[in-house]
Amino acid sequence: MGDKIFHNLSGKTLVATPHAITKGIYHKSLIYMLSHTEEGAIGLIFNRLVNHIDLKSFFKIKNDEITTPVMVPIYLGGPVEHEKGFFLHSSDYNKNLLLDFQNDLAVSSNLEISEDIAFGKGPKNSLFIVGYTAWKPGQLEEELEKNLWLVMDCNKEFIFADNPESKWHNALKHLGIDEIHFSSQIGNA
């Protein structure tokens, strides 16, 4: 058997396969892939809304100009390091970026972006996500071979859609998949 070809999925979206992942955090999840190398992979789930937070109190923004709470949704990005927060946002905001992508998205993880969002000077679109998803070397490739994930190009409309509950179903529709008729008996040719 020959060596497997590595396909970098950085900047792509993983869509949990219907019927393959039936419970837990990854059930009906959409994951934006931040990094995918032969050393492993990291991504952010962007359709697991868990609560809303006040940016001013959460980030301890000390500014008397903001007198009312600035409420933003908070998403669970995965089971790793819930104390870490990230803003997945449109690339129109480019201060102190953690990651910058070719597909008009960026990731920030600093106090400055939270202050800019609170003042209405932040990115046009953003999600605040705590935690992330990580795979060891070869782990994601094994999951892909088992058909646990479908891969689609990044679609900002899905990422920043208002209704997180419909994002997964809309991604399936975009891929031309009907969840009801999708067979759990799948394989690779």
Curated annotation (Swiss-Prot):
A single cellular component GO annotation: cytosol
Instruction: Kindly give the NCBIfam families that the UniProt entry links to this protein.
Output: PRK00228.1-4
Pfam families in the record = DUF179 (PF02622)
State the InterPro entries in the record: AlgH-like
Q: What is this protein called?
A: UPF0301 protein RF_0044
What SUPFAM superfamilies does the database record attribute to this sequence?
VC0467-like
Say which family it is in: Belongs to the UPF0301 (AlgH) family.
